Amino acid sequence: MEELKAYRPKTSPELDPSTLSNYTCFTVKLTTLHFDIDFEKKIVSGKVKYDLLNKSETDHVDLDTSYLDITKVSIQNESCDNQYKLHSRKEPLGSKLHILIPASTPKNFQLEIEFSTTSKCTALQFLDKEATDGKNHPYLFCQCQAIHARSLFPSFDTPGIKSPYKFSAKSPLKTLLSGLLIKEDNENNTVYFEQPVPIPSYLVSIALGDIARTSIGPRSDVMTEPVNLAKCKWEFERDMENFIQVAEKLIFEYEWQKFDSLVLPASFPYGGMEIPNLCQLTPTLICGDRSLVNVVAHELAHSWSGNLVTNCSWEHFWLNEGWTVYLERRILEALAVIEAKQQGKGDKEAHYYGEQVRQFNAIIGWTDLENDLKSMGDNVDKYSILVQDLKGKKNPDDPDDAFSTVPYEKGFNLLYLIEKIVGKEKFDLFIPAYFREFRFKSLDTFQFIDYLFDFFKEDAVKLDQIEWKKWLYEPGMPPIDPKFDTTLAQACYDLAKKCYQYALSEDDENEFTQFKLVANEINDFSPSQNIVFLDTLIAYEKVAGFSWKQHKKTLNRMATLYHDQYTETLNAEIKFRWFYLQATGEVLDFEVAMGEFLGTIGRMKFVRPGYALLNKVNRELAVRYFQRFENRYHPICKAMVRKDLQLD
């Protein structure tokens, strides 16, 4: 661990460079937040009240804001309108709201601020009713991670501080907030929610529109537009309670009472967002075969890793996401064991199969990481480091710019390596101990490492052999090959190799007859195996000088053979990879198909690399499609794609 001394912060948890607030000076005992929604003006106004303990006896409060109008400030119910200043904007962090605390103010005091959002709010997306599936009512949802809560309300906008919340909102439409419903006042169109578990600002959320609800388990509901409710119920109800029970056995009891999910409109920019009691999900998961429910397992795992135990800043994001991917794969492994036993396999064989499933999912993640690093271009040395440096040279860096699969997959692989070193049984004792130790807290990487070495004193020498500096502070892929079990992937690799070999001899008609027989092997593939098959085909690009655009005949024949399975699939993970393969070969029909597909979704996992590929093979088409669809995207997604296409 000597090699890490130079990186250890002076104090832990490390200070967050992505906030303008003086959050370390206070304990937030309670946050009371009210929203008033105006669909005509497309703004949210409201008031936030902080019950604060001034633990450092400072004479001011600094809060984060971004494109907010501040209309009133008071302390202990006394106006402070002459004692605050909204500083000029400092990109990318916004505008500091500086409030002087009167000398007579007690150590425990209340601060109340009235505010309204503006048209530049980056957290909110207002949708006209025509942009919804039901076409009956407008819709509003928000996405605050990483630093967008400050554009919704004045806040200590950092994961480094948490608070319980009391929420209320006034709107004529069905309204949901990140907590438990306490009361509905239908006469005044006002709802009241509470979140008793302390949460950081990025987990604050609001959604409203034409929303219906149905049960999918004893402690779980799913909510979405009425026209989609039956499909969502079918997709999730088989697995939901099983997911929770397996996670509880792995970690400890679920803290949040209910795990409810909201399937949002297509413009939602992520696969899921782990809002407590209001897990937000992309509609791309609704594919009719339950093959993408792993995203729900991921968001559920966040109930412990991220929501209960939180990274202290976005520099240490891997503590949220690496842990969550690890737990997600353990949950899916355990369910695979149960399924294998139900199919008559013995205990040993079932557990072996479960481990194969986990490692197969890890293979998919490894490929995603490789592809992500390739797409980073000149930024790979900066953004492929596990512990990010967001402090910047002149101004802090935007955490959104650093968002990638690195904290997810590089983080997972570090935890997987630790598990292999100490042994799975011993690591399983560490999991609940770690989450109990840091429950309700925010921590940095060094606190994790210190606790790890303290817990595994007997294995300290072995853990010290990990190349910690390479893992945490050097760019690129993980420094060791994890050598995952390829049993479930081998058939995918073999078929991809046959397709590649066929492409090399595609003018031979006899070869095509044989290829048609071989191609049908995908009929026996699971959805995940189809993903690995397509990933492997894409990966042949530029290997030993090979280029798919020189083998369009093969791509065209594959398009004929695989039309039903791939072009018409409802599985967005498969469809995106299929279009990506064909567009890599510069098949114009599929470049157009990719562009049209990007107009039906808002999930950045597909939108950003999709436009990046189109920009590479046909920039005119990429720009034309983006300009056609950009107003459909959430502000976060729109801003990132504009950067990717260098349109600003």
Curated annotation (Swiss-Prot):
| Catalyzed reactions | an epoxide + H2O = an ethanediol
What's any one GO cellular component for it?
cytosol
- Main subcellular localization, coarse class? cytoplasm
Enzyme category, top tier = hydrolase
Q: Where does this one sit in the cell? A: Cytoplasm; Nucleus
InterPro entries for the chain: Aminopeptidase_N-like_N, Aminopeptidase_N-like_N_sf, ARM-type_fold, LTA4H, LTA4H_cat, M1_LTA-4_hydro/amino_C_sf, M1_LTA4H, Peptidase_M1
A GO molecular function annotation here is: epoxide hydrolase activity
Q: Please give the CDD domains that the UniProt record associates with this protein.
A: M1_LTA4H
Q: Give the matching SUPFAM superfamilies.
A: ARM repeat (SSF48371), Leukotriene A4 hydrolase N-terminal domain (SSF63737), Metalloproteases ('zincins'), catalytic domain (SSF55486)
Q: What is this protein called?
A: Leucine aminopeptidase 2
Lineage, uppermost ranks: Eukaryota, Fungi, Dikarya, Ascomycota, Saccharomycotina
